[in-house]
Amino acid sequence: MTWKGSGQETVGAEPTLWAISDLHTGHLGNKPVAESLYPSSPDDWLIVAGDVAERTDEIRWSLDLLRRRFAKVIWVPGNHELWTTNRDPMQIFGRARYDYLVNMCDEMGVVTPEHPFPVWTERGGPATIVPMFLLYDYSFLPEGANSKAEGVAIAKERNVVATDEFLLSPEPYPTRDAWCHERVAATRARLEQLDWMQPTVLVNHFPLLRQPCDALFYPEFSLWCGTTKTADWHTRYNAVCSVYGHLHIPRTTWYDGVRFEEVSVGYPREWRRRKPYSWLRQVLPDPQYAPGYLNDFGGHFVITPEMRTQAAQFRERLRQRQSR
């Protein structure tokens, strides 16, 4: 399989639907990654599945760069876009912040979860691309927990607390899970209106299923990774692919015969250790990965003996910590 998605346009190349997430361009070392992204043809589309940056000006810079290069850019927010830090020129919070970002994208011609769903009609199509903003509701519970309160208590006891708890305001909703439930209901209503015969590409920053979270080094972090309310969406809404990020574990897996693509870049300290074969991930047409292309866990990077040793040592430390 030939990858063309991180270089200049290739003469005669056919249109491709690409995806990427977790660019985190506010981090030193990641802005050059964004600047290196080019389509392989003038008609390529790009899905940006959240966590572009934290500051509104950096989010604008990143999306503006990409929309000037790709024929269409489709963005969904991650949790980091919804953070309000004291360094942000726009001190807006919660839903007002999300609305501001949607308006920003609208001005640039970038598709968001609030726009009509675009339809990919090139190779691998037709397929309706469904950008979604769903958040999470703490229902991906860690072992030993039967409720959100118990799960959060276990996580705190093990020093696992997402920064969202301090920087992601849910206002005007009372809680982040209340905001999540409103978004899930609104999105489900739109999905139910689709032609059930037409394939979809479901795009969300967070995984629609709990299973991808099993690869997390800190399993308690799953609390901030999605909702069980979307567990059957990939089959119910005829998905040919589910695109997500957030976990910073770039990999391809299949659940119920549906391809799931985790397309994150992650932080420099992460990707420098296990740089993926390509920054951009092909969504359509189906890439048909050759045998041996993906590593043992579906990852898009080589696992070295040193990495295996470090992972085993980490798991042992984690086991000891959890058994205390």
Curated annotation (Swiss-Prot):
A Pfam family recorded for this sequence: Metallophos
- Alphabetical UniProt keywords: Hydrolase, Iron, Manganese, Metal-binding
* Catalyses which reaction(s): holo-[ACP] + H2O = apo-[ACP] + (R)-4'-phosphopantetheine + H(+)
Where do the annotations place Mn(2+) binding? Answer: D22, H24, D51, H248
Its top-level enzyme class, in one word, is hydrolase
Name what cofactor the protein needs. Fe(3+); Mn(2+)
Loss of this gene results in the following: Deletion mutant is highly and selectively resistant to the amidino-urea compound 1-[(2,6-diethylphenyl)-3-N-ethylcarbamimodoyl]urea (compound 8918).
- What are the recorded GO MF terms, alphabetically? [acyl-carrier-protein] phosphodiesterase activity; metal ion binding
- Record InterPro entries: Calcineurin-like_PHP_ApaH (IPR004843), Metallo-depent_PP-like (IPR029052), Pantetheine_PDE (IPR052963)
EC number per UniProt? 3.1.4.14
Cross-referenced CDD domains, in alphabetical order?
MPP_superfamily (cd00838)
- Annotated residues that bind Fe cation are located at D51, N79, H205, H246
Q: Which domain of life is it from?
A: Bacteria
Q: Which family does it belong to?
A: Belongs to the metallophosphoesterase superfamily.
Q: What does this protein do?
A: Catalyzes the hydrolysis of the phosphopantetheine group from substrate holo-carrier proteins.
- UniProt protein name: [Acyl-carrier-protein] phosphodiesterase PptH
